[in-house]
Amino acid sequence: MKKYTDLEYLKLSKWERFQYKFLSFFAAIPVAIWNLFKGIGGFFKKVGLGVANEAKDIWTTFVEGDWKTKLSYLVMGFGCIARGQVLRGLLFLLFEVVFIGYMVLMGAGYLGLLPSLGTKGPYQITEKIEYLPGRFREVVKTVTYADDPTVDNSFKILLYGVLTIFFIVAFIYTWRVNVKQNKIAEGILKSGKKLKSGKDDLRSMVDDKFHATLLALPLTGILLFTVLPLVFMILVAFTNYSSAHNGGETGLFHWVGLQNFQTLFSWDVGGVNYSATFGEILLWTLIWAFFATFTNYFLGIAVAMIINKKGIKFKKVWRTVLIMTIAIPQFISLLYVSKMFTLNGLFNGFLMDLGIIHTAIDFWGQPTLARVMVIIINIWIGIPYLMLIATGILMNIPADLYESAKIDGASGWKQFSKITLPYMLFITGPYLPTSFTGNMNNFNVIYLLTGGGPHVNLSNGAGNPGDTDLLITWLFNITQKGFGEDGAQYYLASVIGILVFIVVAVISLIVYNLLPSVKNEEDFQ
């Protein structure tokens, strides 16, 4: 395919430009795929070289180090303590003691059971209960983990098994830092310099390393409350974990490999068409995200331009009125609006009183109408945010650009399309994929307005999906209502969560890299 220079491209007609861009997009796909695999290969090569260099450095440090350094390979912190860095050495030693204690008391056991997720499940016993003097009856009782600690708990095995792996990785990293510290300390002493004392270490925590001190707690929180649950959720997708495995005779769950992914993409499993259900909900989710993003974006800009227009009075009043929708919690406003449009709601009553309609309109009972309604109501919610963003940007567009355009005879539409819109896209471009992602996971609007209903076209499926359900609300219903004998299907919800992430990540990366603010950032500056 021939590549045009900038001058040649400008000479093309609009249709030829469109054709050129269209063909260029598809021509770039093989190159992009090749670069992707090339990047993946380069990443693994870089990781391999990094591991090899680390291993070489560890061996060299051990061979060339003194006896204090060598002993630190076994007893963390020994070299630091022996060289007078007592505080640093005690922290290393304490971490090692805690790690060994955890592994002996809990970690090793859970890690050993991780491949099977437990073998001893809840069991039944028969008890004799005296209900009258000298008269007994037999009662069958199920003994669970709560009654007998020797019964395996698959949930805890998976959770603590993952936590143990995290702990092992943290220990290896800390051990490596311990080795490096000994190498550095040995080199400093050989050069005749003095090592930092415990007071110096504490002082540096609020001085040159203050950033590390501030980030320590947030990073720990992210690891424990974001990364760990995320890994746990991903692993659940490869098990048969459901509410049926929370206790009773089926308290254990096991690894099933890719079976859950196969189930989701199967046409018929136990009378349920998972693949068609997932496809329809995914399509509606993408349609919803598209309209929810771009209607709010362009209408928000339009409202900001109208309010900012010269001659418009009470600008602060109009902005305040719009901001009121932000000030009121969505939980309250959306539930109220939902009730307004019911069969016996305020809106139907108002139209009937005026004689416009004689039969109440079922806004939430018709699939197409319900979908249109949630998009319209989302516009009411989202416009004020974009209005505020656009107002600030519009005030910063140089006025001389518009004056020059007027002198050249540019119409209002030309000024908008050639000055305002490009400027807005440069500044707010990254907001679009962010907003699109947020709308794909917009739980509040759908759940509070329709609850996912009506249940007309998608009545048969896990979680009882509705016609306005997004992937995120369907996922939620699967974890609450479930379907069939398994009850709440946590494994299926995890699979959907992984697929949602993949879809959102791919779309966001593609759109982000096509934005003018990314491609032409230097030109704008």
Predicted regions mapped to residue ranges:
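N-terminal signal-anchor/first transmembrane alpha helix
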Residues: 2-42, 46-56, 74-82, 86-89, ...
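Hydrophobic, aromatic-rich alpha-helical transmembrane segments
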Residues: 14, 21, 62, 66-69, ...
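Ordered, small/hydrophobic-rich secondary-structure cores
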Residues: 59-152
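A short, mixed-charge helix-start or loop-turn motif at secondary-structure junctions
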Residues: 59-60, 202, 457-461
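Generic hydrophobic, helix-prone segments enriched in Leu/Val/Ile
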Residues: 62, 111, 179-183, 438
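A structural signal for multi-pass alpha-helical bundles of membrane permease subunits
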Residues: 106-114, 210-525
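Membrane-interface segments at the starts/ends of alpha-helical transmembrane spans
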Residues: 121-125, 129-166, 266-283, 361-367, ...
